[in-house]
Amino acid sequence: MYILVWKKGQQIKTFHTLDEAAQFKAASNIDEAQMFSVTVASAISASGGSTEATNLRRLMYLSKSTNPEECNPQFLAEMARVAFIRNREIRVSGFLMYSSPFFIQVIVETDEDLDFLFAKISADPRHEMCIVLANGPGTGRMYGDWHMKDSHLDSITTHTAMKTILYQIARSFSSMWIYLQKSAANMLMLGKDPAAQPPERRSVVVTFIYLVEFCSIFSHPNLTEKTADVLSTFVYVCVKNVEGSGGNIAKFIPAICMTYWPIIRTKEALTAIQQISEDLAQLRSQQAQGSAVSLRYSQAGVHYGRGMQCNAGSRKSDFTLLGDCINTTSRIATLAKKLKTPLLFGFEVRCLLGDEKREEIEGAGIHQVKGRDKPVVVYQFPGPDLDVAMVRQKIEQFTPGRFRCQMPVVEYEALPISQRPPIFDDTPKSNPRPRTPGYGGRQRSDSLVDRLIRIANLSGFSESATGDTTLTTLTYISQATRPMSRLDLSAIMPTATRRNAQQSNIGTVLHENGLFVQTLEGPKDAVVNLYLRIRQDPRHTDVTTVHMAPLQERVYTSEWTLTLATEEMLATFPPVQDVLSQLAKSYTSLETYVPSTVVRYLTAGNNPRNLMPVSCGVVMLATDISSFTSLTEISSFTEVWMICNTFIDACTSAICQEGGEVIKLIGDCVTPYFPGNNADLAVAAAQELFIFCRQLREAFVDVLDVRGCVSCAVGMDYGQVVMAQCGLLRLSDYVAAGAVSAGVVEVEAITREVGYQFVVTVPDADRVQPQFRDYGIEPTPQAIGGLPCYGIVREVFDLPVESIKRGIKAMHAARSGEQPLTEPEQAKPDFRVSPGRDRHGVSGRRSNSSQGKGSIQVG
C-alpha cells in the first residue's frame, strides 16, 4: 500500500500501487507531496500470539526549530503532553529531546502507522529540515511505556560538555546532509555505511541534462557575475522535475545534471525532461530586461543500460552509478547539440516506451559516437529545433541593463583574506612529501588533517606556549579499536591531565559504547599539536574533525584540565547515548561525501549557505582509465567496481597529497583543481598516478587479473572558474564551473588520438615550474577552443592505445582458454612504446626521447 500526503499533511489518500499514486498526483497537478510505502502485516501470529514485536520499526530524526526562543522546558513539556495523549491511543512509544535549536525524536511503531505519523510530524510548522538519522526494524520497544518522553537538554544535565558536543555534531550533520546523494542518504537512514555496501546491479534509464552554452555565458564580461544565479535556477528546475517524477539526481557536474530512473518509469523520465525545457521557457518569458535567466536553455540525452550502483573512493567518496551506459548517455547528449534537438534518446529507450508514445517520436538517424565501435540509433520528438548558434548569438548580444542578480560573483583575489572562502589550502609546506602516494592504511584521514599537519610542521612540536596563541576549540569523534573498561579509561586521565596543564589545554572527553567524543580548548598551536598526537593513538581509529574555530573566551573552567564524561553523566536520560552514537556514526560516513571547501567552512563555525560565489584562476586536471570500455566488456560487474575503486583511491590520494581539491567523481573520471600559480603540484600528482598505474600493472599482469591492464591518461588546462553554492534546502552542491571544466575533459580525450599519456594546453605549459623543464613538450595536431595542445615527451608518458587494447584481448583469451593471438607481439600486453614509433595523427613525428630534437622545452 502507498500513502500520498500533501497540503502540509492535511490531505491524505491511499493507493494499492505506486503507479496509481503517481498518476493521481500528476492528474491532480500536485507539486508538493510525499509518497510513503506501507507494509500491512497480520497482527496475530500463527500460534495465536501478537506479532507486534517483529513488525516494529524505529525511526530517529533530527529537525530544526523555526522559533528557538519559545522552546523552553515548559513549552517542550506541553508538546510532549499532547503527543502522549495521541500516541497512547495508537500505541506509539519514543522520546523527544531539544538541544537549541535542534529537535531529536525517536518513534517506535508498527510499519503501517509509522509512515503516516512521520508524514504529519514533518508538516508541523514548529520545525523544519526533518532529516532521518535511522529508519529500520526494531526488536522491541526500547523505551517501554514512554508514549512520548520529553526532555529539554537543560533538564537532562548541566554539564557544558554534553551541550557543546550535541550542538556541534547536530549542527554539522544537518548542514552537510543536503549535499548527500539520495541513495547514500537512504543507506544512512537504514543504519548502513554506504562505503561498506557491495555493488548492486541495476537496469536504469540514464539522462544527461545540459545547460546550453554555459561556457559562453561564463565568458561574457557582462554575465560572469550572474553565473551563480544561472546555475542555481537550473539546479532548482532539475530537482523539482526529476524527483517529482520518481527519478534520482545522481550528481551535478558544472552546468550538467546527471539523473536516472528505474526502467518502469521511462515515460516519466522523458516527460520530466520535456517539462524542464518548458519550465525554463516559461522562466525566460517572465524575466525583466537584463536578467541572465532569460538565456537558459536545456538539452538532454537519454540512454538505457545495465549499471552498477556502488560506493567509489574512500578519502573522498561518491555513491554513484558505474557502467558503460553512463559514457554512452553522455555521448548521445553531446550529439543532441549537433542535431539541434532539445531531447535525444537511443533505440533501447524507444523499446521501453508504449505503443502510444512510440507514435509521437521520429528517427534522428544512425551516428558514430566516441567510445563505441558500433554506431547508435537515436530518436527525437517532433518540434522546433534548438539551434545552439542562436543561443550563442543571443548571449553575445546580451546587455545587462539595470537588473541586479541575487548572488553576484566577486573576484577571489579582490576579497580581504578573512572573507575568502577556503577553496584552497594555502598553508605552505615546510618539508616536501614523498612523490609516491600512500594507499590504504588503518587510519582514516579527515578533511582538515592536511592543513593541521602543515600548521604543526611550521610551528614545531614545542611544549611551550609559543607560536599562534589564538584561543581555539576543536571537537573530534573516533571509534575505539577495542572494548574500553573503566580501568582503561581511568588510566588515560593522569597522563592527559598533566600534558594538558603544561600546554594550557582544557576540555572534556566522552566515551560511550565504543565512541570517543573529545573537545579541546587552548592556544591554537597547542591544540593542533595535541590533536595530531591523538590521531596516532592506536586505541582509536576513524578520527574525524567535527568543529574547529576561534573562541572569544573559554567554555570550560580552568579546573577542567580534562574531564572524563561517562555513563554517570547520562544516567538521568539514557536515550542520549543512543542519539549521540547515531549522530556520530552517521557524521563519520557523511563527511567523505561533502565537498572539502564546505567541510572546511563548516568546521570553522560558519553556515555553508553563506559561502560567497567567487571567480578565480585554477589549474585543472582530468584523468580516467584508458580503454575503460574495452575493460568493461571483458570484466564482471564486481571487477569493474574493483578497478574504479582502486583507481579513484589512487587519484584522490595523489591529488590531496599535492594540495589539490577533488571536485567530482564521474564514473572512472576524476576532475581536481589546483591553485592557478602552482601547476607543478598538478604535474606532481599526475606523476604519482602514472607510477601507481605502472606498479599496479607489474603486480597483476602475470595472474590474469584485470588490474594488470589498467593505464590512465591526464589532461591539464588553466582557466577561470566560478565557485558557488547552488541548489535547494533538500539538495545542494558546491560547484566549480567554467569553460576550463569542459575544456580539460576534451584535452584528456585527445590523449588517445596523439599517443601521449599527459597532454597540456599553452597556458599550463607557461605555468609549469623550472624543475619540470627536463620534460620536453611536443605540439599535437588538435587544438581545444583555439588553443594548441602539447604532449609531455618522455617514453614513460607514451600512451599506446592499440597495444593496451591488444593486451586486454590477450588477457581475455587467456582467461577463457582460447588460443593465443598468432602475432607474437600481440600476445603480450605491452604498455611501452618502442623508440621511433609513429603516433596516430602525427605522421612523421617521433617522440623527443627517440629523436633527441624537435621538441619545445617547458619554461
From Swiss-Prot:
Its main location: other. Residues 420-444, 814-859 are annotated as: Disordered. It is found in: Cell projection, Cilium, Flagellum. The keyword Repeat applies. Disulfide bonds: none annotated. Residues 56-149, 471-563 form the BLUF domain. GO terms for molecular function: blue light photoreceptor activity; FAD binding. SMART domains: BLUF. One of its GO terms (biological process) is cyclic nucleotide biosynthetic process. Pfam families: BLUF. One of its GO terms (cellular component) is motile cilium. Residues 825-841 have a biased composition (Basic and acidic residues). Residues 845-859 have a biased composition (Polar residues). The keyword Magnesium does not apply. Heterotetramer of two alpha and two beta subunits. PANTHER family: ADENYLATE CYCLASE, TERMINAL-DIFFERENTIATION SPECIFIC (PTHR43081:SF1), ADENYLATE CYCLASE, TERMINAL-DIFFERENTIATION SPECIFIC-RELATED (PTHR43081). The ST- strain is deficient in phototaxis. It is not known if this is due to defective adenylate cyclase activity or defective BLUF domains in this protein. In wild-type E.gracilis, photoactivated adenylate cyclase is found in the paraxonemal bodies (PABs). PABs are absent from this strain. This is Photoactivated adenylate cyclase subunit beta-like protein ST-. The gene is pacB.
